[in-house]
A protein has these predicted regions:
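A boundary/linker detector
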Residues: 1-13, 28-32, 85-120
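A short glycine-/small-residue-rich loop at the edge of a beta-strand within enzyme catalytic domains
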Residues: 3, 7, 18, 65
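Short cysteine-rich loop/turn motifs with clustered Cys
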Residues: 8-37, 60
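Histidine-centered nuclease catalytic patch
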Residues: 25-57, 67, 73
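Short histidine/acidic/glycine/proline-rich micro-motifs that form metal-
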Residues: 62-67, 95-96
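Substrate-binding/catalytic groove segments of enzymes
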Residues: 66-73, 84-90
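Conserved catalytic core of Hanks-type protein kinase domains
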Residues: 81
């Protein structure tokens, strides 16, 4: 079952890739913008962490494909990125009840993007 994308997904993806400096966080490549993806450690259907910044990482197409197909490698990458405690905390947040506040998330992401753009 494919999860439908919406404007908040696009904003989240833009933030994650901007935060990474428009580079792949696994191999360091800088593909064009269409070749750089926002990968979710915990899949997008888990609404409680769908737009959680710890759940997103910027990957080139090749690394995205590789981690999607190699879950053990994805887990190892996730631990290197977040640390074991960060991974455990993210997993705990997947079990949160209720719907995320989409308006608040939108405001937060726009502010974070603005801060990143002002730093450059």
């Amino acid at each position: 079952m494919k999860v439908r994308r919406d404007p908040l997904d696009d904003l989240f993806s833009f933030y994650i890739r901007t935060r990474a400096g428009w580079k792949c966080e696994r191999c360091g490549r800088m593909p064009d913008r269409r070749g750089l993806h926002c990968h979710h450690f915990e899949r997008r259907r888990k609404k409680s962490v769908r737009w959680d910044e710890d759940n997103g990482v910027s990957l080139c197409f090749g690394c995205h494909q590789y981690l999607d197909e190699n879950r053990d490698e994805e887990k190892a990458f996730m631990i290197r990125k977040l640390g074991q405690q960060g991974v455990d905390m993210l997993k705990a947040r997947t079990r949160a009840y209720g719907m995320p506040d989409r308006v608040l998330i939108t405001i937060y992401l726009k502010q974070k993007i603005k801060e990143l753009e002002n730093d450059n």
